[in-house]
């Protein structure tokens, strides 16, 4: 690159300090069709929070993500329109030739620097590498790419490179979606070794109100829900392999105990194989099921299902921090009990009726404890690490044979989730659905309603199942010494 262009770049950088952003109000007032929103997320959305509404024991809050943080300076109407046209229509991992060329040039100019910042001498300000690349693309092509889109594009290219390398070694490797498999097929060798933990805690829920309460959800159209969930890109640098969650290779994160040589018959090995319950010293999750029941035929279709089995692998919680609100990290760092944090990777079955009006979307869940208390369950749907909606439910104990059960059957799923599922189905292509689900998570926090003692925290990630039945793998989240901050 000649010196003249470098000089032009340095002069223009100070003028590009504001990322193009769109406020939540703008998004809700006018959203593109569902087939466009995959690439129309914008960082730095100036979030507006709707007032919290309460009724009985249930609370629902709809609050758009806070955006890109201090680096964003709000939205400018002329650039917002330009940005939408700039960012729409790109396939996953595919940018136009001019943008990709500028992207490659910027990669060469700005070498990887980890979480460190690069100082622009003329400005005296510090910038992350991805932000500088985004600014360079804007200067070079006049088209907007946010720093998070740059981060995502880098990761997409890295995953493609990995798949190409694997294909050369192993031949034709089926795609991620073709090998999405039940929990038994998720196990893989370890690249990061953590000591196994004997006891485990977990819990799971969908966004679902208690059956005795009415659902309180703001009136939001389906396209608005889609746009609500896609305003920015996550910061990930993990590689994708078949059948593993949220575009990540869990084999890079988990420890799997080496199993002895199988010298016994399959029947005997099944008998001696030890399974771990999803439980802690205070609370046990026995089962969870989110389902759709047709009122006309009484046919019940399971969307998500968890059984009382914990995987033997442990995963570093820090790699998931940016998938969830900051509350997750705060809870983990402050909690004296580190055994109450879990990840549930769910392969969901969305082959359900499109007749939403004549179908019941509901949740069944069953917990137990040897202690008597009331459970408070806070469940948040999150998009790109930011809370979108929250629901709070109450579970009351039922004493039986010296223990206490917490049962909630036929609890209606909230309108937000019903509309999200309907909108997701419109994408038709499973791979596209999974790309969407990479940025959608659910966080459940279970506490003692009287003392606020933390009992369980479960982080949900989702993928569309290729099988007719849903499945799930639950892992313990531990402190692996990592840090996902940029």
From Swiss-Prot:
Keyword Transcription regulation: yes
Region (Disordered): 47-87, 165-188
Tissue: Expressed in HSN neurons in embryos and in the FLP neurons from the L1 stage through to adults. Not expressed in touch cells. Also expressed in larval hypodermis, intestine, pharyngeal muscle and other neurons. In adults expression is lost from some neurons, is weaker in the hypodermis but remains in the intestine. Expressed in HOB neuron, ray neurons RnA and RnB, and the ray structural cell, Rnst; rays are male-specific genital sensilla (simple sense organs).
Molecular function terms from GO: DNA-binding transcription factor activity, RNA polymerase II-specific; RNA polymerase II cis-regulatory region sequence-specific DNA binding; RNA polymerase II-specific DNA-binding transcription factor binding; transcription coactivator binding
InterPro entries: TEA/ATTS_dom, TEA/ATTS_sf, TEC1_TEAD_TF, TEF_metazoa, YBD
Resulting phenotype, residue 91 to V: In cas140; production of an extra neuron from the Q lineage and a mild egg-laying defect
SMART domains per UniProt: TEA (SM00426)
GO cellular component, one term: transcription regulator complex
Highest taxon, organism lineage: Eukaryota
DNA-binding region, residues: 88-164
Effect of mutating residue 140 to Q: In n998, n1087 and cas6; two-fold reduction in mRNA levels. Production of an extra neuron from the Q lineage and a mild egg-laying defect
Keywords recorded for this protein, A-Z: Cell cycle, Developmental protein, Differentiation, DNA-binding, Neurogenesis, Nucleus, Transcription, Transcription regulation
Biased composition (Low complexity): 47-57
Compartments it resides in: Nucleus
Function as written in the Swiss-Prot or TrEMBL entry: Transcription factor. Binds to DNA sequence motif 5'-CATNNNNAAATGCAT-3' as a heterodimer with egl-46. Represses expression of genes involved in differentiation of touch receptor neurons (TRN), probably acting as a heterodimer with egl-46, perhaps by occupying similar cis-regulatory elements as an unc-86/mec-3 heterodimer. Plays a role in cell fate specification of neurons, including the hook neuron HOB, and touch receptor neurons.
The protein's name: Transcription enhancer factor-like protein egl-44
């Amino acid at each position: 690159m000649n010196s003249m262009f470098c000089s032009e770049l340095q002069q223009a950088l100070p003028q590009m300090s504001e990322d193009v952003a769109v406020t939540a109000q703008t998004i809700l007032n006018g959203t593109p069709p569902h087939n466009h929103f995959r690439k129309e997320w914008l960082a730095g959305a100036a979030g507006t929070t709707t007032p919290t509404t309460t009724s009985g024991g249930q609370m629902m809050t709809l609050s758009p993500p806070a955006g890109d943080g201090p680096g964003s300076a709000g939205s400018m109407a002329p650039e917002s329109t330009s940005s939408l046209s700039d960012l729409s229509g790109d396939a996953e991992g595919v940018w136009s030739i001019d943008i990709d060329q500028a992207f490659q040039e910027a990669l060469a100019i700005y070498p990887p620097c980890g979480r460190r910042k690069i100082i622009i001498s003329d400005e005296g300000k510090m910038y992350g590498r991805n932000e500088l690349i985004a600014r360079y693309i804007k200067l070079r092509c006049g088209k907007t790419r946010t720093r998070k889109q740059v981060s995502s594009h880098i990761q997409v290219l890295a995953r493609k490179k990995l798949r190409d390398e694997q294909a050369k070694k192993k031949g034709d490797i089926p795609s991620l979606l073709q090998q999405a498999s039940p929990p038994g097929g998720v196990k893989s060798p370890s690249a990061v070794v953590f000591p196994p933990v004997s006891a485990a805690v977990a819990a799971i829920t969908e966004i679902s109100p208690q059956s005795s309460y009415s659902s309180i959800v703001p009136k939001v159209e389906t396209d608005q829900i889609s746009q609500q969930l896609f305003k920015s890109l996550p910061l990930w640098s993990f590689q994708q392999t078949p059948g593993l969650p949220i575009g990540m290779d869990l084999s890079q994160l988990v420890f799997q105990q080496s199993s002895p040589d199988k010298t016994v018959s399959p029947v005997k090995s099944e008998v001696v194989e030890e399974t771990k319950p999803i439980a802690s010293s205070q609370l046990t999750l026995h089962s969870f099921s989110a389902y759709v029941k047709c009122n006309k035929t009484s046919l019940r279709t399971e969307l998500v299902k968890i059984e009382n089995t914990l995987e033997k692998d442990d995963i570093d919680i820090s790699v998931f921090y940016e998938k969830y609100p900051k509350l997750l990290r705060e809870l983990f760092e402050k909690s004296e009990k580190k055994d109450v944090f879990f990840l549930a990777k769910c392969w969901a079955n969305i082959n359900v009726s499109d007749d939403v009006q004549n179908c019941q979307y509901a949740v069944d869940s069953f917990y137990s404890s040897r202690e008597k208390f009331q459970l408070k369950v806070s469940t948040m749907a999150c998009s790109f690490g930011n809370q979108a909606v929250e629901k709070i439910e109450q579970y009351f104990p039922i004493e039986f044979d010296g223990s206490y059960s917490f049962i909630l059957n036929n609890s209606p799923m909230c309108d937000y989730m019903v509309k999200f599922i309907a909108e997701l189905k419109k994408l038709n292509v499973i791979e596209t659905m999974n790309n969407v689900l990479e940025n959608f998570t659910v966080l459940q926090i279970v506490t003692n309603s009287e003392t606020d003692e933390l009992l369980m925290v479960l982080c949900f990630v989702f993928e569309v199942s290729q099988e007719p039945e849903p499945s799930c793998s639950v892992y313990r989240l531990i402190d692996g010494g990592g840090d996902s901050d940029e």
